[in-house]
Design a protein with these regions (language model features):
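Short juxta-domain linker segments that transition from a proline/glycine-rich
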Residues: 1-151, 156-232
Length: 232
């Protein structure tokens, strides 16, 4: 697990939890995470059936994973350029796709980590800046190719379009103000995965095809995307 509960003494287990969150007391935990929650909450309607402590733990694990990666100064131009190469990785989906994705982003100063979801979180991903370094945290919760890649490009949109002080957590409900930025990130992701123009072209042709699955696979290669993003 993420926290060492091997010690028998309750106080030692308690200290292990504090150590995981890098705080010295329960009050320090609430103080730190209430500030983080406030940064998100002004755009959130509610957390629904999500456990906020599990959400905090998931976010914290992402920070720990990010700290294990080298830090490189962020370069927006290089990151935007890398997205074209990442689109090709998405289309081909090699076995080491995540390592390639992580490496290309890191060269542009963006850390990308994969953190499995905890119970009662159901989060797709998150974007935030930690010590002036961009972090994209992905869960691949549903183990679906299309959701994974859409979430990545959505988070990339937040990095390129929105402020460094903002925290974005996908899988939560947002206020009208916050939803505007979510919609902007969605539109950004659509351009890289399966654009509206590409979708329109598909619908103009597919109903005349006898083998629609074969056509989708061919069309995906033509527009440099993965068939799963088309089928959705």
């Amino acid at each position: 697990g993420w926290i060492d509960y091997s010690k028998n003494e309750i106080i030692e287990q308690f200290n292990a939890v504090l150590s995981f969150f890098s705080v010295s007391s329960v009050d320090a935990y609430h103080s730190h995470y209430e500030i983080e929650e406030a940064e998100v909450a002004f755009r959130m309607i509610n957390t629904g059936d999500k456990n906020k402590h599990n959400v905090n733990a998931w976010l914290r694990k992402g920070e720990i994973q990010a700290n294990e990666l080298p830090t490189i100064e962020f370069d927006a131009t290089k990151f935007k350029s890398a997205l074209d190469s990442i689109k090709t990785i998405m289309a081909n989906h090699p076995d080491n796709f995540f390592e390639q994705l992580q490496s290309l982003c890191l060269q542009a100063g963006v850390k990308v980590v994969h953190t499995p979801c905890l119970p009662k979180t159901r989060l797709h991903g998150s974007t935030r800046w930690i010590n002036n370094t961009a972090l994209i945290q992905l869960s691949n919760q549903y183990q679906r190719n299309d959701i994974f890649w859409f979430t990545f490009f959505h988070e990339a949109g937040h990095i390129l379009k929105h402020g460094k002080k903002e925290v974005f957590v996908e899988g939560l409900q947002y206020t009208a103000e916050g939803q505007i930025k979510e919609d902007e990130a969605d539109k950004f992701a659509v351009k890289y995965t399966f654009s509206e123009k590409e979708e329109e072209t598909l619908y103009q042709k597919i109903f005349n095809e006898e083998d629609q699955v074969k056509f989708i696979n061919q069309y995906a290669k033509e527009i440099n995307t993965h068939p799963a993003t088309i089928i959705g």
